[in-house]
Amino acid sequence: MSKGLPEARTDTAMSELVPEPRPKPAVPMKPVSINSNLLGCIGIDTIIEQMRKKTMKTGFDFNIMVVGQSGLGKSTLVNTLFKSQVSRKASSWNREEKIPKTVEIKAIGHVIEEGGVKMKLTVIDTPGFGDQINNENCWEPIEKYINEQYEKFLKEEVNIARKKRIPDTRVHCCLYFISPTGHSLRPLDLEFMKHLSKVVNVIPVIAKADTMTLEEKSEFKQRVRKELEVNGIEFYPQKEFDEDLEDKTENDKIRQESMPFAVVGSDKEYQVNGKRVLGRKTPWGIIEVENLNHCEFALLRDFVIRTHLQDLKEVTHNIHYETYRAKRLNDNGGLPPGEGLLGTVLPPVPATPCPTAE
């Protein structure tokens, strides 16, 4: 008996030291998708009409920036895109405004209504870009402006008493105008697109395409695409943002055939075969802006407005703005930029020493 007692005590002591095995946490079940045949109409498809009605009531913002050296018809093209005088031509500037010594940013807002839908359009012009003897880093004020709009939106978003609808001044689309030299891109072109394509949706266009023959235009487009590829520059729509095979197929065709769009702009109408058409009069005849045999303006218009406008806005918000937002919040410890929750500047948090074991 006495020999068995210590063994019993040892067993008890060991059982006290060994913890009971913990039950495994419950694994959440994955939702199972089952294709059910509806027994009748429930009205799911009316969500599209609901969204349409809401958009018609509130309207939507669209902010487009035009960049390129003077004389490439930037304002004319934008006016042609929206069939209204939404961009101020250089010829209407004061004498002092004609040759800015540095790159300036000029934003003009308009409200355009079509079919009951209101678009709050802002056209951002960049006079002075590429017009100086030394154009080094002339893209910096443009990048600064774009980031300032992200910052403005971020401050509104993290505000405790934020507005129900935050005014959106973020640049959704940047049309970059390439001079129709027919040779190659300038170092400035490459430098601009390399930096700005990381923060905004850049769409390259060849300006005044009527100055080139069809063969010259085709060769120049291929050369531009090749130079952008060699320099690792991705323009909108970027391959990595294609959501599915349908998107990829559609966007591949745009990337490989249409880009950069070779365009001609005009806000003047002429009579051609009994029809009034937008065009440019030349000694050889009328260049019809919306005729695909003459230029690719119609492709650009359809791309920017009719097929990809919503995607331009979504990529701006979900990719470019989100990248900026994550970096700013990460740099600031997850708090609003430079401020605490009550709008006061927070002092640095001292490191808490680890408690020493006694």
Curated annotation (Swiss-Prot):
Modification after translation (UniProt): Phosphorylated by PKG on serine residues. Phosphorylated by PKG on Ser-91.
Main location: cytoplasm
Comp. bias (Basic and acidic residues): 1-10
Location of the protein in the cell: Cytoplasm; Cytoplasm, Cytoskeleton; Synapse
GO biological process: cytoskeleton-dependent cytokinesis; protein catabolic process at presynapse; protein localization
GO cellular component, one term: cell division site
Region named G4 motif: 207-210
Septin-type G domain span: 58-331
Coiled-coil spans in chain: none
Pfam family, one: Septin
CDD domains assigned to the protein according to its UniProt record, in alphabetical order: CDC_Septin
Cross-referenced PROSITE patterns: G_SEPTIN (PS51719)
Annotated stretches, region: G3 motif: 125-128
Annotated region (G1 motif), positions in chain: 68-75
Gene Ontology MF annotations: GTP binding; GTPase activity; identical protein binding; molecular adaptor activity
Residues recorded with modification Phosphoserine: 91
Chain residues that bind GTP: 68-75, 102, 208-216, 265, 280
Domain of life: Eukaryota
Summary of the tissues where the protein is detected: Brain-specific, with highest expression in the hippocampal CA3 region (at protein level).
Similarity annotation: Belongs to the TRAFAC class TrmE-Era-EngA-EngB-Septin-like GTPase superfamily. Septin GTPase family.
Function: Filament-forming cytoskeletal GTPase. May play a role in cytokinesis (Potential).
The protein's name: Neuronal-specific septin-3
Organism: Rattus norvegicus (Rat)
The organism's taxonomic lineage, starting at the top: Eukaryota, Metazoa, Chordata, Craniata, Vertebrata
Recorded name of the encoding gene: Septin3
